[in-house]
Amino acid sequence: MARLDESGLADLAAACESEDVLARWRAKVVTVEGSSCAWWTGAVSGRGHGRFWLSSGRVVVAHRFAFAVVHGVEAAAAVPVLGHRCDNPLCQRVGPGHIVASSYVQNRREWAIRRAHAGSPLGDPRGARQRARELRDMAREDPALVAVDLARLRALCGEQLALW
């Protein structure tokens, strides 16, 4: 995410306090049986992350908005990188095992290690963007389809072992 200037941080703070904006964000998040992630069903970036419009002309990475809602705008602004410990760029769940504060170096190191594990979603042959779009579309249509696709990937590639 490009660093937000003062105006952007003010927009983010206002969005975090707006029931209308929060309701709009929540409407784009679904649960999938068998997954502890909160799945984004809105717009997706080229890297497979959710994109969320705070207001006209102001878009943020959806999980950064979620982090700001949970931890506050100052905390979100202070964190250079948010890591997905669940390896799901669509995930909106903030907390251990999912979206956590990280650094660029730590995030890239963890990505490289986990990508090499059999069954890792990071090694999905569709690539991050296509995988995210397909899973997002499934989650929109019927969240149960996501569970089927995740099971298919595990059967195809094997189970991913926990890194920690």
Model-based region annotation:
Residues 1-56, 74, 86-94, 134-137, ...:
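Short helix-coil boundary/hinge micro-motifs
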